Amino acid sequence: MLLLIGAGIGWFIESETPYAATWFAENGPVEWPQAVVVGLAAVVFAVCAWRSPGPLGTWCIPIAYLLACAIVREMPACESHFYDGGACIERSWKTVLVTTGGAIMLVGFFLRRHNLMAMIKPRWSFVFWPLGIAFLLLIVAEVGEKFGHEGIEEMLEFSAYIHAFCFSVWVFGQTRRPQPTGRSERSHVPFGRPIV
């Protein structure tokens, strides 16, 4: 449904309105809402990782990192020939940010190393299947770009980021704040089944 809605809106703006060239231009207006939404999703997943010290929270670490990388990707490079002003990040700093984020992710994995084997069990990994929908939307968006449909590409990307943000809010509701030492933290998975 998201695929059809996003593609339909993108196609309509692209083919039926005079604003497509401006709206979908490199560093155009659509880039900023995308960056904001994916940034919010990354923050929520990072908070979920802090709130849940178990496998659920451990899964949120790489997800937050990948979403943060998406923010860097959405921000224009200052050296780009398409850059025409506004906020930007130099390519060298993009590399620094991605590398630093990767290092933080590895530290998080090290601190949660006791969860690494548990997190790959279907009981935990299947919780995050909705992100596969966002990934599918991004793949179709890339196909749209290759065929010259920038409107479809950008709106599918936007749909993917909105979907990821909504899912991050759901995950937030399945986690609880860290409990004092000596008390086990309980979180929830679909259908209200509690798991430790």
Predicted regions, residues:
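Alpha-helical transmembrane segments
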Residues: 1-11, 64, 131-136
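Terminal transmembrane helical module of multi-pass membrane proteins
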Residues: 117-122, 126-178, 182-192
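Membrane-proximal helix-loop-helix units in multi-pass membrane proteins
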Residues: 64, 68-121
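Membrane-interface helix-boundary motifs at transmembrane edges
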Residues: 47-59, 113-125
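Alpha-helical transmembrane segments of integral membrane proteins, especially early/N-terminal helices
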Residues: 1-2, 52-68, 161
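Juxtamembrane "helix-exit" motif on the non-cytosolic side of transmembrane helices
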Residues: 12-22, 75-84, 113-115, 140-148
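Short juxtamembrane and helix-loop transition motifs at transmembrane-helix boundaries
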Residues: 18-27, 58-62, 84-87, 119-120, ...
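Alpha-helical transmembrane segments of polytopic membrane proteins
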Residues: 26-39, 90-102, 153-162
